Regions:
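Short, isolated positions within intrinsically disordered regulatory regions of eukaryotic proteins
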Residues: 8-9, 88
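Peri-catalytic and regulatory segments of divalent metal-dependent proteins
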Residues: 18-140
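Bacterial N-terminal signal peptides that target proteins for export
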Residues: 1-8
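Polar low-complexity intrinsically disordered regions enriched in Ser/Thr and small residues
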Residues: 10-11, 26
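C-terminal motif of bacterial Sec signal peptides marking the signal peptidase cleavage site
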Residues: 13-16
Length: 140
C-alpha cells in the first residue's frame, strides 16, 4: 500500500511539473481555468470593497498603457488570458497588481512613484508577467 501511495505521489509531481517562460521549473497543482476563476472572483470582491477612481482621464491613461503592454504578449501566451481588464482604485497605496484571469488593479497612489508612462509601463509589465508566468498557481 505504501509503495502504491508513493508511486502515485511521484506520478502526480511529475505530471504537475511545468516550466515558466524564463525556463524555471514550477509545480502547478491546479488547472489554469480554476486559477483564472479564483482571480476573477477575487477581483470582483475587491471592486466591491475598494473605492474605484472616478477620474476618467487617469483611467484612460492607465488603460492605454496596459493595452500597449497586452498587445505585445506573444501569441503563445495569449490563449491563457483572453480579456484583460484594468481598474484604477482610489487609494494612496503605491501599488498595482494583476490576477489570474487577466485582471489588473492600479492604485492612484502609484502615481507618486510612477511619474510617466514608461515607469507605469514597467510596473504593469511586471504585474502582467506574474500572470503569464503562472506565479499565482505556484502559490496555491
Amino acid at each position: 500500500m505504501k509503495r502504491w501511495w508513493l508511486g502515485g505521489l511521484a506520478l502526480l509531481l511529475v505530471a504537475a511539473c511545468a516550466t515558466s517562460p524564463t525556463g524555471r521549473k514550477q509545480l502547478i497543482l491546479f488547472g489554469d481555468g480554476e486559477v483564472a476563476q479564483l482571480g476573477l472572483n477575487s477581483f470582483d470582491e475587491l471592486k466591491k470593497q475598494e473605492k474605484i477612481s472616478t477620474d476618467k482621464k487617469m483611467t484612460r491613461y492607465v488603460q492605454c498603457v496596459a493595452d500597449a503592454i497586452v498587445q505585445e504578449i506573444p501569441a503563445s501566451y495569449k490563449t491563457s488570458v483572453a480579456d484583460w481588464q484594468v481598474v484604477l482604485f482610489d487609494s494612496n497605496d503605491v501599488n498595482a497588481f494583476a490576477l489570474p484571469g487577466g485582471r489588473i488593479g492600479v492604485y492612484t497612489g502609484l502615481f507618486k512613484a510612477a511619474k510617466n508612462q514608461d515607469q507605469l509601463a514597467a510596473v504593469l509589465g511586471h504585474e502582467v508577467a506574474h500572470v503569464l508566468a503562472r506565479h499565482s498557481n505556484e502559490r496555491l
